[in-house]
């Protein structure tokens, strides 16, 4: 399973660890992904999504039914 948010599309980024001596080594910044299930009133069922913490805030703001309809419009299976 890819480390990608289903709602926002956030994926790992590449950057550097920087020491006090300014030595740089490559590292990955991973999105804060959570496996969550949301209750959809309109569909009367639970919907499982792998979402980032930022996407949880988006779902709180817009509502799960709006977010799921946007996912389906993009062609994702939910």
UniProtKB/Swiss-Prot annotation:
Coiled coil: none annotated. Keywords: Ribonucleoprotein, Ribosomal protein. GO terms for biological process: translation. The keyword Ribonucleoprotein applies. One of its GO terms (molecular function) is structural constituent of ribosome. One of its GO terms (cellular component) is cytosolic large ribosomal subunit. Belongs to the bacterial ribosomal protein bL28 family. HAMAP family: Ribosomal_bL28. This is Large ribosomal subunit protein bL28. It comes from Aromatoleum aromaticum (strain DSM 19018 / LMG 30748 / EbN1) (Azoarcus sp. (strain EbN1)). The lineage of its organism: Bacteria, Pseudomonadati, Pseudomonadota, Betaproteobacteria, Rhodocyclales.
